[in-house]
Amino acid sequence: MLENQLNLLDKLFEEWKKTDSQEFGSDSHFAFSKDGIICSDEYGKNNPKLLFIAKEPNAGGVYNSDIFWIKNFLTDKSQKKSLFSNRIVMMSNCYYNTDLGYDVLRKISYMNLKKTAGSSRCNYNNLKKYCANEERRKFIKREIEILSPDLIVCCGNDVKKILYNIFCNNINYKLICVKHPSYFFISNLAYKNDFESKIVRKRRK
């Protein structure tokens, strides 16, 4: 089943990449960044499937379509950690009730709504325009369908608003929304407590 998911994702990304290249051309600053399943050996294995959805890749000056940045933490332990990545790990360990550090990323999936690199601050109008394209709306829905998550975590309210727009306010997935993981005006403890409380409420439904 998982091998089929990976094949479906590859086919989807090829179509998606063609659509993006028609708009952005071959400019390396708009290289298409694949995402999805982080570790094919672990995703969904005796666990509920957790999907984090963010706005766009933050390339940090490196534009390479072969780089799935969050996956690199598993192969390059020296890679610099960020507040964003630390909180993705924190929420994942909290959700699975584990203490695996960054290895917990093997259990989850991760996707960006926009597949071309952004900067340190997302331009929301550009993001809305990107996601308003009818083909891309289908691609976003299709990727979520392939990943078939038991829970979606929206990384920021902008993500939630766009998803509700894409699904016409009829999302058939369990979904919670957290503050953007890079939001530094809240402590990690308060951030974790907020995530836990939302998980508890969602599990009661």
Where are these regions (language model features)?
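Proline-aspartate-enriched helix->loop->beta-strand connector
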Residues: 140-155
